[in-house]
């Protein structure tokens, strides 16, 4: 599957640019034939990834950029969100935020860390590389039957 189109954007790591990426993704996904529900899932996952970069990658006095890439294939989209800011320990975040139990009162739920779990739940495949900043690669298939062929859920490279 080497024949694909690629769209790349570079935006300042500021909250007001999250919507620019969402609008671009929405247009691309609609053109590809994704359902309304899948487009909403894609927009939420991308918003979470970019918001994480905006909030955590760069210090307050440091300006940074976020690279966003869309690999457009016949049957799926691959999305890359990358920054060159500070990295994080994925296993530590997982331990601090989960697991959650249905009987736990909402008031006692820990804050933060939901973004990565939400991305994982909404996308068909998620890979995180946090060696030089953070790069999140995620993909979603147009037809849900395709997921079974490539259902390797989440992996990390540290």
Curated annotation (Swiss-Prot):
It holds the Pfam family HATPase_c_2. Disulfide bonds: none annotated. Transmembrane segments: none annotated. It comes from the Bacteria. Its EC number is 2.7.11.1. It catalyses: L-seryl-[protein] + ATP = O-phospho-L-seryl-[protein] + ADP + H(+); L-threonyl-[protein] + ATP = O-phospho-L-threonyl-[protein] + ADP + H(+). InterPro entries: Anti-sigma-factor_SerPK, HATPase_C_sf, RsbW. Keywords: ATP-binding, Kinase, Nucleotide-binding, Serine/threonine-protein kinase, Transferase. CDD domains: HATPase_RsbW-like. One of its GO terms (molecular function) is protein serine kinase activity. It is an enzyme of class 2 (transferase). Belongs to the anti-sigma-factor family. PANTHER family: ANTI-SIGMA-F FACTOR RSBW-RELATED (PTHR35526), SERINE-PROTEIN KINASE RSBW (PTHR35526:SF9). Negative regulator of sigma-B activity. Phosphorylates and inactivates its specific antagonist protein, RsbV. Upon phosphorylation of RsbV, RsbW is released and binds to sigma-B, thereby blocking its ability to form an RNA polymerase holoenzyme (E-sigma-B). This is Serine-protein kinase RsbW. It comes from Oceanobacillus iheyensis (strain DSM 14371 / CIP 107618 / JCM 11309 / KCTC 3954 / HTE831). The lineage of its organism: Bacteria, Bacillati, Bacillota, Bacilli, Bacillales.
């Amino acid at each position: 599957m080497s024949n694909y189109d690629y769209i790349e954007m570079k935006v300042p790591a500021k909250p007001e640019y999250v919507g620019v990426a969402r609008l671009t993704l929405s247009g691309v996904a609609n053109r590809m034939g994704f359902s309304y529900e899948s487009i909403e899932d894609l927009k939420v996952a991308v918003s979470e990834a970019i918001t994480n970069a905006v909030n955590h990658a760069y210090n307050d006095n440091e300006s940074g950029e976020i690279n966003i890439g869309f690999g457009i294939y016949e049957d799926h989209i691959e999305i890359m969100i990358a920054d060159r800011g500070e990295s994080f320990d994925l296993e530590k975040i997982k331990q601090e935020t989960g697991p959650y139990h249905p009987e736990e009162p909402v008031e006692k739920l820990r804050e933060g860390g939901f973004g990565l779990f939400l991305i994982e739940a909404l996308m068909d495949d998620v890979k995180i590389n946090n060696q030089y900043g953070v790069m999140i690669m995620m993909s979603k298939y147009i037809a849900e039957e395709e997921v079974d062929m490539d259902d390797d859920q989440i992996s990390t490279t540290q």
